């Protein structure tokens, strides 16, 4: 079994150390096959700051203030919350996807599949107005996935078109 120290030594495809979640794992959440994308864990690296950066450093530098103003205690708490409880996945640019947890705004993580395809890396994230992603294609919606289809006997006579 890996120790916490060994987890801390795990690095992303660019050599940046992964951040541990509140349970001591490098996996912050999961994208499953049912979500119409390759199944893999969601991971966050320390990353790089700057406009071409990614990961925790990039989000802290560019979006920490808005995340705190939205009621989160930290960027770390924001990432963990959205990675665990996103309800919609939308198609982004250049092979990225948006994981959204909606309320008055969309709490959003931008993720991309790693080169090896073994994890989803958090590229960026923040709090965005709902119109930001309004026209982006929906890949998965938890509300649609949880709607059971009616059994054959559950159809009303007027709905039976056979």
Regions found by a protein language model. Give the residues of each.
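Ribonuclease/tRNase effector modules and their secretory precursors
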Residues: 1-162
